[in-house]
């Protein structure tokens, strides 16, 4: 660093470098040259970077400790190849174009009577709508499942149909995305979550708001953390997690979060 | 997707809207499932990479550049010239190209009389030698044209005059060859022939003219028809060059002289001032 700095900056006051250590530090300098050599020696002893050690006890106010880190490195064999990521980005782009193309058509479609979309502010309502009552309430009623063979979206959660997703405004998309990501922070990855996240990202319009950027980055970091804890490659969740990280990093230009082969 | 949409519209007419909605509503879900499944396929086999590599090499573009060279054709020599046409002709004396206008045409002989626009003299030329535009020819070709032009002009001079007049022409050409006899001959026939003694006097004046008054430019003849003499010969040009060099050298010398004179005056004044001061002290 010093050599670089010396080369870059012009020398305003040329002073010969002190090779010999004849001068003692205890005695005061007798002439200007000695003083300058003292200064040089002290400067060479200082480190380039100094980190202050803060004692938490002495802090008067309570401050929030935010430790923001990048995506955790994927275990060996878990990360997807670059070609696969490029394919997914191109297909995702095509899906987004198709959604935009047919948005007007699907907006005109009327929903069935059993489909009741919650309000934008209703976080619990949206969770129930997307994941179903079973996942939300963590109820495991195998007997009832056997009794009712037909599809009951109220309990299993509504899939992200185009007729439903097309009716969401950008603010609603952002809000629902936030609800799902907050839910994901505390719980495990479920298939319904993957489908809804994919659908919401497909509807999220560019350029993104700063809040949207923060949400998707949070999603990518959470996905990488979950992926790091997976036990084997054959886990069904690995593909979905890789897909989410790939879409956020490659398509939405968060390249610092991208997987490196 | 477009086909799917059309099918949906068609099915809707039949009243199967629920099924079609559900079928196409799941496009996003199917895309998601496809994406998730593709990762598993990528993990399983390495065979998938091979066809991609085959697809990678694209066709090389061939650059076929066609060089079309355009050949410029000179004016056709078979052009029919008419009286009053503008053209370019080589003067027989120096072989240079000058702008001219045709004053008379003789189709039988293939010759014509041209009036040089910039100089005012006339000359007989072959119709085939005239040019519509000044060509961009090499020096060798130009020299060749000059030689041909000289030969043709000599033949013309021999043919164009009667035996008596030709005799006079020969005599005059011998005495006044350096002055440009071909330019004088065409103008003689139209005017009436003067008496012998008067003619001799004119000849004498011509002999006297070039010497004392104008070394390189003979004077115009007041009695005869007006004519512009040929351009000056080489020796006066050389003299002029020497004069230019001499004047340049003289100006250099004079500037040095003036500088020295000024320096001398200045030094003299200084010495005078010094002597006065020393005298006072």
From Swiss-Prot, chain B:
<dbReference type="InterPro" id="IPR049481">
    <property type="entry name" value="SMN_G2-BD"/>
</dbReference>
<feature type="region of interest" description="Disordered">
    <location>
        <begin position="42"/>
        <end position="77"/>
    </location>
</feature>
<dbReference type="GO" id="GO:0015030">
    <property type="term" value="C:Cajal body"/>
</dbReference>
<keyword id="KW-0694">RNA-binding</keyword>
<comment type="subunit">
    <text>Homodimer. Component of an import snRNP complex composed of kpnb1, rnut1, smn1 and znf259. Part of the core SMN complex that contains smn1, gemin2/sip1, ddx20/gemin3, gemin4, gemin5, gemin6, gemin7, gemin8 and strap/unrip. Interacts with ddx20, fbl, nola1, rnut1, syncrip and with several spliceosomal snRNP core Sm proteins, including snrpb, snrpd1, snrpd2, snrpd3, snrpe and ilf3. Interacts with elavl4.</text>
</comment>
<dbReference type="GO" id="GO:0043204">
    <property type="term" value="C:perikaryon"/>
</dbReference>
<dbReference type="GO" id="GO:0016358">
    <property type="term" value="P:dendrite development"/>
</dbReference>
<dbReference type="GO" id="GO:0003723">
    <property type="term" value="F:RNA binding"/>
</dbReference>
<comment type="similarity">
    <text>Belongs to the SMN family.</text>
</comment>
<dbReference type="Pfam" id="PF20636">
    <property type="entry name" value="SMN_G2-BD"/>
</dbReference>
<dbReference type="GO" id="GO:1903862">
    <property type="term" value="P:positive regulation of oxidative phosphorylation"/>
</dbReference>
<keyword id="KW-0966">Cell projection</keyword>
<protein>
    <recommendedName>
        <fullName>Survival motor neuron protein 1</fullName>
    </recommendedName>
</protein>
<dbReference type="GO" id="GO:0032797">
    <property type="term" value="C:SMN complex"/>
</dbReference>
<keyword id="KW-0539">Nucleus</keyword>
<feature type="modified residue" description="Phosphoserine">
    <location>
        <position position="17"/>
    </location>
</feature>
<feature type="modified residue" description="Phosphoserine">
    <location>
        <position position="20"/>
    </location>
</feature>
<dbReference type="GO" id="GO:0048841">
    <property type="term" value="P:regulation of axon extension involved in axon guidance"/>
</dbReference>
<keyword id="KW-0507">mRNA processing</keyword>
<keyword id="KW-0963">Cytoplasm</keyword>
<dbReference type="Pfam" id="PF20635">
    <property type="entry name" value="SMN_YG-box"/>
</dbReference>
<dbReference type="InterPro" id="IPR002999">
    <property type="entry name" value="Tudor"/>
</dbReference>
<dbReference type="GO" id="GO:0048675">
    <property type="term" value="P:axon extension"/>
</dbReference>
<dbReference type="GO" id="GO:0007528">
    <property type="term" value="P:neuromuscular junction development"/>
</dbReference>
<dbReference type="GO" id="GO:0140060">
    <property type="term" value="P:axon arborization"/>
</dbReference>
<dbReference type="GO" id="GO:0032991">
    <property type="term" value="C:protein-containing complex"/>
</dbReference>
<feature type="region of interest" description="P2 (binding site for SNRPB)">
    <location>
        <begin position="225"/>
        <end position="252"/>
    </location>
</feature>
<feature type="region of interest" description="Disordered">
    <location>
        <begin position="1"/>
        <end position="20"/>
    </location>
</feature>
<feature type="region of interest" description="Disordered">
    <location>
        <begin position="145"/>
        <end position="242"/>
    </location>
</feature>
<dbReference type="GO" id="GO:0030018">
    <property type="term" value="C:Z disc"/>
</dbReference>
<dbReference type="GO" id="GO:0008045">
    <property type="term" value="P:motor neuron axon guidance"/>
</dbReference>
<dbReference type="GO" id="GO:0043005">
    <property type="term" value="C:neuron projection"/>
</dbReference>
<feature type="modified residue" description="Phosphothreonine">
    <location>
        <position position="14"/>
    </location>
</feature>
<dbReference type="Pfam" id="PF06003">
    <property type="entry name" value="SMN_Tudor"/>
</dbReference>
<dbReference type="GO" id="GO:0005737">
    <property type="term" value="C:cytoplasm"/>
</dbReference>
<dbReference type="GO" id="GO:0036464">
    <property type="term" value="C:cytoplasmic ribonucleoprotein granule"/>
</dbReference>
<dbReference type="GO" id="GO:0070050">
    <property type="term" value="P:neuron cellular homeostasis"/>
</dbReference>
<keyword id="KW-0508">mRNA splicing</keyword>
<comment type="function">
    <text>The SMN complex plays an essential role in spliceosomal snRNP assembly in the cytoplasm and is required for pre-mRNA splicing in the nucleus. It may also play a role in the metabolism of snoRNPs. Required in motor neurons and proprioceptive neurons to ensure correct U12 intron splicing and proper levels of tmem41b mRNA. Required for the maturation of motor neuron axonal branches and dendrites.</text>
</comment>
<dbReference type="GO" id="GO:0051124">
    <property type="term" value="P:synaptic assembly at neuromuscular junction"/>
</dbReference>
<feature type="compositionally biased region" description="Pro residues">
    <location>
        <begin position="179"/>
        <end position="197"/>
    </location>
</feature>
<feature type="compositionally biased region" description="Basic residues">
    <location>
        <begin position="59"/>
        <end position="73"/>
    </location>
</feature>
């Amino acid at each position: 660093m010093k050599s670089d700095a010396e080369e870059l900056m012009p020398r305003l006051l040329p002073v010969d470098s002190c090779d010999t250590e004849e001068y003692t530090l205890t005695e005061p300098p007798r002439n200007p040259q000695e003083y300058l050599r003292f200064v040089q020696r002290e400067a060479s002893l200082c480190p380039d970077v100094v980190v202050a050690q803060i004692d938490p006890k002495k802090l008067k106010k309570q401050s929030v400790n935010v430790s923001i880190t990048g995506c955790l490195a994927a275990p060996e064999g878990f990360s997807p190849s670059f070609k696969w990521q490029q394919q997914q980005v191109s297909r995702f782009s095509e899906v987004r174009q198709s959604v935009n193309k047919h948005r007007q058509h699907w907006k005109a479609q009327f929903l069935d009577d059993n489909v009741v979309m919650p309000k934008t502010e209703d976080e619990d309502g949206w969770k129930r709508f997307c994941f179903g009552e079973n996942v939300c309430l963590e109820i495991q009623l195998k007997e009832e499942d056997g009794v009712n063979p037909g599809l009951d979206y109220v309990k299993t959660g509504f899939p992200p149909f185009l007729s439903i997703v097309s009716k969401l405004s950008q603010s609603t998309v952002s809000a629902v995305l936030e609800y799902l990501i907050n839910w994901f922070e505390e719980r495990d990855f479920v298939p319904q979550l993957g489908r809804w996240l994919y659908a919401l990202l497909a509807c999220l319009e560019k350029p993104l708001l700063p809040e949207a950027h923060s949400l998707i980055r949070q999603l990518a970091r959470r996905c990488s953390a979950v992926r790091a804890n997976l036990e084997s490659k054959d886990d069904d969740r690995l593909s979905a997690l890789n897909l989410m990280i790939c879409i956020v990093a490659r398509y939405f230009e968060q390249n610092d979060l991208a997987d490196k082969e | 997707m477009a086909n799917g949409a059309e099918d949906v519209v068609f099915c809707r007419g039949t009243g199967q809207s629920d099924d079609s909605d559900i079928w196409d509503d799941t496009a996003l879900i199917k895309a998601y499932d496809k994406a998730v499944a593709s990762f598993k396929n990528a993990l399983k086999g390495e065979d998938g990479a091979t066809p991609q590599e085959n697809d990678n090499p694209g066709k090389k573009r061939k650059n076929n550049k066609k060089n079309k060279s355009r050949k410029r054709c000179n004016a056709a020599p078979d052009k029919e010239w008419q009286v009053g046409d503008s053209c370019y002709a080589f003067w027989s004396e120096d072989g240079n190209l000058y702008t001219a206008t045709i004053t008379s045409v003789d189709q039988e002989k293939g010759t014509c009389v041209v009036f040089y626009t910039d100089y005012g003299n006339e000359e007989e030329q072959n119709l085939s030698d005239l040019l519509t535009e000044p060509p961009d020819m090499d020096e060798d070709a130009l020299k060749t044209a000059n030689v041909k032009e000289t030969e043709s002009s000599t033949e013309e001079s021999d043919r164009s005059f009667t035996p008596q007049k030709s005799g006079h022409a020969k005599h005059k050409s011998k005495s006044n060859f350096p002055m440009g006899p071909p330019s004088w001959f065409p103008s003689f026939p139209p005017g009436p022939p003067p008496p012998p003694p008067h003619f001799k006097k004119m000849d004498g004046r011509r002999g006297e003219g070039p010497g004392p008054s104008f070394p390189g430019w003979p004077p115009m003849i007041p009695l005869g028809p007006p004519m512009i003499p040929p351009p000056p010969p080489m020796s006066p040009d050389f003299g002029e060059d020497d004069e230019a060099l001499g004047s340049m050298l003289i100006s250099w010398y004079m500037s040095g002289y003036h500088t020295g004179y000024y320096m001398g005056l200045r030094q003299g004044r200084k010495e005078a001032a010094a002597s006065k001061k020393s005298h006072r002290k």
